């Protein structure tokens, strides 16, 4: 019971020594059905009269009386067979009714299971759809943020490039202006050595007096005075 689909059942039953159904293979019968089947097993024929039985017992059996039970047995045997068939058909009807009830119950349970499964599937589908929509919105938002950030950095890079170009242009202009001013201030000058005589005398003195260099100290002082005088003269003329 409760399966997703209904299948055809093959049902068999067994009879006891009184030809009553006791075992129904494949389906468990309820107590109500078993009670109904027990009621069908009850003998509907009324019991024989006790007086008549007593009269038969006091009578001396004769040849005709001896043959009576056989005749009576022959007449009642078809009735018993017919009664057995009727009882069997009643039991079969009860079984079929029970099977139909079980089948209806199984179909209803299967329908409920399928309905619940469909509802769960729909709910899950809705949840997945909502989750997909939410993820899509988050992705769109993130993509918009990345685009805005990319545009911001691109603008910053463009501004930095413009500033660097402007600085380079200004530096180049300043350099060229300074170079032009420097070229205008520079004049051709003839440089002549100063104090050449004293320089030659000092060199000769040091060669001659390598072990007594103090003898050249007066020439060295005179050479330094000559150099200082030349510096002062240069500053005065080009100051």
From Swiss-Prot:
Pfam families: MIC19_MIC25. A lipid is attached at residue 2 (N-myristoyl glycine). It comes from the Eukaryota. Residues 79-166 form a coiled coil. Disulfide bonds join 195-226, 205-216. This is MICOS complex subunit mic25a. A motif (Cx9C motif 2) lies at residues 216-226. Component of the mitochondrial contact site and cristae organizing system (MICOS) complex (also known as MINOS or MitOS complex). It comes from Danio rerio. Residues 192-234 form the CHCH domain. PROSITE patterns: CHCH. One of its GO terms (cellular component) is MICOS complex. Residues 50-78 have a biased composition (Polar residues). The lineage of its organism: Eukaryota, Metazoa, Chordata, Craniata, Vertebrata. Residues 27-88, 113-133 are annotated as: Disordered.
